Amino acid sequence: MAKKSLIAKQKKHQKFAVREYTRCVRCGRPHAVNRKFGVCRLCFRDLAYAGAIPGIKKASW
């Protein structure tokens, strides 16, 4: 889990757009965040396995 201070710092409006970055809305992780769903790869996997994301299922071929 991310520190609350880092999450609050990220939410503030940055002076330069290049300084803004995405964080997972579920756990606060700053890396490997999927822009479409707003969650990191770990949370995405958990939500997909639980069936919480419609239309997403494990690939099998």
Swiss-Prot record:
- Provide the residue positions that the database annotates as binding Zn(2+): 24, 27, 40, 43
Alphabetically sorted, this entry's keywords are: Metal-binding, Ribonucleoprotein, Ribosomal protein, RNA-binding, rRNA-binding, Zinc
Q: Which cofactor does it need?
A: Zn(2+)
Under the heading InterPro entries, the entry gives:
Ribosomal_uS14, Ribosomal_uS14_bact, Ribosomal_uS14_CS, Ribosomal_uS14_sf
Q: What cellular component terms from Gene Ontology apply here?
A: cytoplasm; small ribosomal subunit
- In the record's cofactor note, how is the cofactor described as bound? Binds 1 zinc ion per subunit.
> Which GO biological-process labels does this protein carry?
translation
Offer an example of a GO molecular function term for this protein: structural constituent of ribosome
Q: Mind telling me which Gene3D superfamilies this protein's record contains?
A: 30s Ribosomal Protein S14, Chain N
List the Pfam families: Ribosomal_S14
SUPFAM superfamilies named in the record: Glucocorticoid receptor-like (DNA-binding domain)
On subunit structure and binding partners, the annotation says: Part of the 30S ribosomal subunit. Contacts proteins S3 and S10.
Q: What is the role of this chain?
A: Binds 16S rRNA, required for the assembly of 30S particles and may also be responsible for determining the conformation of the 16S rRNA at the A site.
Q: Which PANTHER family match?
A: 30S RIBOSOMAL PROTEIN S14, SMALL RIBOSOMAL SUBUNIT PROTEIN US14M
- NCBIfam families in the record, alphabetically? PRK08061.1
Provide the family line. Answer: Belongs to the universal ribosomal protein uS14 family. Zinc-binding uS14 subfamily.
The name under which this protein is listed is: Small ribosomal subunit protein uS14
What taxonomic ancestry is recorded? Bacteria, Bacillati, Mycoplasmatota, Mycoplasmoidales, Mycoplasmoidaceae
